[in-house]
């Protein structure tokens, strides 16, 4: 089972709100997911990003691949922390 960290679209028309979820890569964008690890609101000024660092790092260590969320994770500094954990720096 290939697991991905991706965005699940919520909200109304023209007012998107996203949940950052861990899901099987075969399930649809807004379908089944394993766990919610954060939220992303692009409508707010500035855009609001809330991610549970412990959960995100846990899933990255277990092999979850980030999709479009890579830029959101790097803005929060999570990819750098994961890299340091993985390579022991």
Curated annotation (Swiss-Prot):
User: What does the entry list under GO cellular component?
Assistant: cytoplasm; small ribosomal subunit
* The name this protein goes by in its record: Small ribosomal subunit protein bS16
Tell me the organism's taxonomic lineage: Bacteria, Bacillati, Bacillota, Bacilli, Bacillales
The UniProt family comment states: Belongs to the bacterial ribosomal protein bS16 family.
Q: Which Pfam families match?
A: Ribosomal_S16
Gene3D superfamilies in alphabetical order: 3.30.1320.10
Kindly give the InterPro entries that the UniProt entry links to this protein. Answer: Ribosomal_bS16, Ribosomal_bS16_CS, Ribosomal_bS16_dom_sf
Q: Name one GO biological process term.
A: translation
Q: Which GO terms describe its molecular function?
A: structural constituent of ribosome
Q: Which gene encodes it?
A: rpsP
- Asked if the keyword Nuclease belongs to this entry, the reply reads no
Keywords for the protein's UniProt record, in alphabetical order: Ribonucleoprotein, Ribosomal protein
Q: Which organism is it from?
A: Geobacillus stearothermophilus (Bacillus stearothermophilus)
PANTHER family on file: 30S RIBOSOMAL PROTEIN S16 (PTHR12919), SMALL RIBOSOMAL SUBUNIT PROTEIN BS16M (PTHR12919:SF20)
